[in-house]
C-alpha cells in the first residue's frame, strides 16, 4: 500500500470491487446476499510502524514502497488514527532535542485506541542505559502534559524498558454495551477499531436466541468471547499464545463476566481432547469437564492458513458454525468440507484494510 493509492474519494469504489470479488469467489456455495461493513475512509488504523531516518540534524519517519523497495518520507499517514498522527510530529521534535533519545533509534511503533490511550515503542541499535530511561521519563511527562495518555517502551537487542505499562486499555461499543479490552504491545489486536466494533455486533446478531454453550477456537484476547457471552449459557474458549491468554483473563475480570472459561491449548490438541484421544493435565488442573458443556455453536477465527482437515471435521459436529476469516482462499477450502453438512445463512465482508486487496470475511453456517 502506497500513499498514492490511498484516496478517500475512491474509497467506495474499492469497497464495491472487493464486495463483487468476494461474492463471485463464493458463488458456488449458494451464499446469501453479502452484508458489507465499511471502514472510515481515513484515520482507521489503530497501530502503525515507521522506520526512523537520520539525515544530518534532521530526523523523520519513512516507509518503503513494497514494489520498488524505495523509501519515502511520512509526515502524515492517512490510514493511522488521528491520535497517532497528532503524536507523530511532537514525538520527533522532542526526540531530536535529545542526543540520548535520538542516538541509534531506528524504528517507532504506535499502538493507539478509540478510548484515547496510546503506547509508543522506540527501537534502538544500541543498549539502553539509565540516562536513556531518565530522558524517556521526561519525554513521557512532556507529552502527557500536552494532553496525551501515553506510555513508552524502549527496545534494543535482548532488552526492554517499560514506562510505565506495556499495554493499552481499549473500550469498544457493541450495541448498548461498552466492553473493556487489554491490548498488549507486540500481540495481536484487531487493527481497525471501528470495523472491529461492527464485527462484534454482527457476531452478536448472528447468535441471538442461541441455546446451550459456545465453543470458541483461536480466541486471542477474548475479543469475540466477551461480546458473545451474553448470548450463551457458557463460553469455552481456546488460545495457544500465553500473552493473549493472560489478556483474555484480565478482560474477563475487567468486564465482570462469569460465564467464560479460557484454556491455553492449540485447536489441534483441543480436537484430540474432545474426541478422547488424549488426556490433558491442564484441563484437570483447571477443573474443566468437557463433557459438562452443551456446545451447539462453535466460533472459529483461525490464522491465515485456515483450519486443518481434522479441525474441520471436528467443527462439522456442531449445529451452528461462525467462521471469521482473514484469508478468503483458505476459507473457501474449508467451506468445501463444511458445506457438505451445513448451509451458509449469513455472509459478510468487513473492510479491515481499505485500499489493499485484503478481505476479512464472516460466514454463519447451520446444519442442513
UniProtKB/Swiss-Prot annotation:
GO cellular component: cytosol
GO molecular function: rRNA binding; tRNA (uracil(54)-C5)-methyltransferase activity, S-adenosyl methionine-dependent; tRNA binding
Chemical reaction(s) catalysed: uridine(54) in tRNA + S-adenosyl-L-methionine = 5-methyluridine(54) in tRNA + S-adenosyl-L-homocysteine + H(+); uridine(341) in tmRNA + S-adenosyl-L-methionine = 5-methyluridine(341) in tmRNA + S-adenosyl-L-homocysteine + H(+)
Residues that, per the record, bind S-adenosyl-L-methionine: 190, 218, 223, 239, 301
Domain of life: Bacteria
EC number in record: 2.1.1.-, 2.1.1.35
Protein name in the entry: tRNA/tmRNA (uracil-C(5))-methyltransferase
Amino acid at each position: 500500500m502506497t500513499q498514492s493509492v490511498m484516496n478517500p474519494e475512491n474509497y467506495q469504489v474499492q469497497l464495491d470491487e472487493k464486495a463483487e470479488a468476494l461474492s463471485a469467489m463464493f458463488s458456488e456455495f449458494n451464499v446469501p446476499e453479502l452484508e458489507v461493513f465499511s471502514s472510515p475512509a481515513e484515520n482507521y488504523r489503530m497501530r502503525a510502524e515507521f522506520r526512523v531516518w537520520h539525515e544530518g540534524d534532521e530526523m523523520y519517519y519513512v516507509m518503503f514502497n513494497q514494489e520498488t523497495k524505495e523509501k519515502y518520507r511520512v509526515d502524515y499517514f492517512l490510514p493511522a488514527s488521528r491520535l497517532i498522527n497528532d503524536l507523530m510530529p511532537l514525538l520527533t521534535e522532542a526526540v531530536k532535542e535529545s542526543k540520548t533519545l535520538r542516538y541509534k533509534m531506528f524504528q517507532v511503533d504506535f499502538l493507539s485506541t478509540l478510548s484515547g490511550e496510546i503506547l509508543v515503542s522506540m527501537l534502538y541499535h544500541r543498549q539502553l542505559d539509565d540516562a536513556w530511561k531518565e530522558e524517556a521519563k521526561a519525554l513521557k511527562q512532556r507529552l502527557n502534559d500536552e494532553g496525551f495518555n501515553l506510555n513508552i517502551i524502549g527496545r534494543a537487542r535482548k532488552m526492554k524498558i517499560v514506562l510505565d505499562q506495556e499495554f493499552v486499555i481499549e473500550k469498544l461499543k457493541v450495541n448498548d454495551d461498552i466492553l473493556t479490552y487489554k491490548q498488549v504491545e507486540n500481540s495481536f489486536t484487531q487493527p481497525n477499531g471501528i470495523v472491529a466494533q461492527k464485527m462484534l455486533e454482527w457476531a452478536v446478531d448472528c447468535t441471538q436466541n442461541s441455546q446451550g454453550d459456545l465453543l470458541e477456537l483461536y480466541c486471542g484476547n477474548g475479543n469475540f468471547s466477551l461480546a458473545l457471552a451474553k448470548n450463551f449459557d457458557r463460553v469455552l474458549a481456546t488460545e495457544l499464545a500465553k500473552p493473549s491468554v493472560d489478556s483474555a483473563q484480565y478482560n474477563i475480570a475487567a468486564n465482570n463476566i462469569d460465564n467464560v472459561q479460557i484454556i491455553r491449548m492449540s485447536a489441534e490438541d483441543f480436537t484430540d481432547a474432545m474426541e478422547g484421544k488424549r488426556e490433558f493435565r491442564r484441563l484437570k488442573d483447571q477443573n474443566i469437564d468437557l463433557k459438562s458443556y452443551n456446545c451447539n455453536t462453535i466460533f472459529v477465527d483461525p490464522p491465515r492458513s485456515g483450519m486443518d482437515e481434522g479441525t474441520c471435521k471436528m467443527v462439522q459436529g456442531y449445529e451452528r458454525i461462525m467462521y471469521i476469516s482473514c484469508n478468503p482462499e483458505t476459507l473457501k477450502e474449508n467451506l468445501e468440507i463444511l458445506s457438505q453438512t451445513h448451509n451458509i445463512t449469513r455472509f459478510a465482508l468487513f473492510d479491515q484494510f481499505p485500499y489493499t486487496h485484503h478481505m476479512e470475511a464472516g460466514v454463519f453456517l447451520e446444519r442442513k
